[in-house]
Regions:
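Structural boundary/hinge residues at secondary-structure and domain interfaces
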Residues: 22-181, 228-269, 290-331
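Extended alpha-helical scaffold/tether regions of large eukaryotic proteins
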Residues: 183, 268-270, 278-287
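Charged, amphipathic alpha-helical scaffolding segments
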Residues: 192-213, 281-292, 296-304, 315-316, ...
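Short, exposed beta-strand/loop patches in secreted or surface proteins that constitute
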Residues: 169-173, 191-194, 276-278
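Extended, charge-rich low-complexity interaction segments
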Residues: 103-104, 195-211, 258-278
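A conserved glycine-rich beta-strand in the N-terminal activation segment of trypsin-fold
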Residues: 184-185, 189-254
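N-terminal Lys/Arg-rich, disordered targeting/topogenic segments
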Residues: 1-24
């Protein structure tokens, strides 16, 4: 009888144990769901209600930038340029062979990564060009991530996505900012990226990313009065805006010339900044802009800038081997 009663007790305990386990699982799921809901609500509130810590893109550009390219809708602007009839005609010319190779390489990158690059959308983007070695230059990419930059979860997942894409990813800190190092297993190239306030900064040269981080609190170009005036003159115009920092042009051009050039130095010592904007349509491609000269500009340069606009036809009879031709007119 005792054995029979024990057997019945064990059978009765089975269903009760299952019910208890089921309750624990349900409670755990409810708590997890509530925690997730609270986190989502917090993230949304933080994203849209908390104050933004935004800084201007130009503040992150290191002072040794020779050229700065600016766009408000980079992907759309690129498609307009690469697909324009004017460019399709120009790229057939022999003199544009090297330029064409670079443009087509960039175009293939844009097309093959269209889904990824579509995330860029209408975001402000800056690309600055810098001399990095005696015969080398590199670019620094600065992309405004807007409110997305406040989502720490997204930043944390970037490394996971990169690893899944085949990159070897390492981390290191510089001046309080985490730098992700993406190594391509095939080419062994390393691309460095960092989130600096509301911007994503990237380059194949680690020193440029570090300089951008350092420039965050000690901007140079962005506070230069000549640059500020130049930027106002071309703001919002054309497909892209290009700024020339004449103070850095001589060292940048020495990459191709092998040494400094007296004519380049002449213009460099006479100019501050130039702001240009590019437009293109079915009939033409044009670049217009403004140059701010120094008060101490060389008289020759001043004469060139103040020359008249009378029509000249000398170019119609010049040899095709002519290296440089300048129109100069005087009142």
């Amino acid at each position: 009888m005792d054995e029979l009663n024990c057997g019945q007790g064990e059978q009765n305990a089975g269903p009760e144990k299952k019910k208890s386990t089921s309750k624990i699982v349900k409670r755990t799921l409810v708590v997890a769901a509530l925690a997730l809901a609270v986190y989502v609500v917090y993230s949304v509130v933080y994203l849209f209600v908390s104050p933004d810590r935004n800084i201007q893109q130009i503040y992150l550009v290191p002072e040794d930038a020779a050229f700065i390219i600016q766009s408000s809708a980079p992907i759309e602007d690129w498609e307009k340029f690469s697909g324009s009839e004017t460019w399709q005609c120009l790229k057939k010319a022999k003199s544009f062979e090297e330029v064409t190779k670079s443009v087509e390489k960039l175009d293939s990158v844009v097309k093959s990564n269209k889904v990824l690059l579509s995330l860029v959308g209408e975001r402000d983007m800056l690309i600055s060009l810098h001399k990095t070695r005696a015969t080398k230059w590199d670019f620094l990419l600065i992309l405004d991530m807007q409110k997305t930059s406040k989502m720490d979860l997204l930043k944390d997942q970037v490394e996971t996505v990169l690893v899944m894409s085949g990159f070897t990813v390492t981390n290191r800190m510089h001046n309080g900012i985490n730098i992700l190092e993406m190594r391509d297993s095939e080419t062994r190239d390393i691309f460095y990226i960092a989130f600096v306030d509301n911007h994503l900064v990237g380059s194949y040269t680690s020193g440029l990313v570090e300089s951008a981080i350092d420039s965050r609190n000690k901007p140079k170009i962005g506070l230069d009065q000549s640059f500020i005036e130049t930027e106002k003159l071309v703001s919002g115009k054309g497909l892209v805006r290009v700024f020339i920092n004449y103070a850095r042009v001589p060292q940048f051009m020495s990459i191709y010339l092998g040494a400094r050039n007296e004519y380049i130095d002449l213009f460099s010592n006479s100019m501050n900044f130039a702001g240009l904007y590019l437009n293109t349509d079915k009939e033409r491609m044009e670049v217009k802009g403004y140059t701010l000269r120094k008060d101490s500009a060389d008289p020759y340069v001043t004469a060139l800038l103040n020359s008249g606009k009378h029509k000249m036809k000398a170019h119609e009879i010049l040899s095709g081997r002519t290296a440089l031709y300048t129109n100069i007119g005087f009142n």
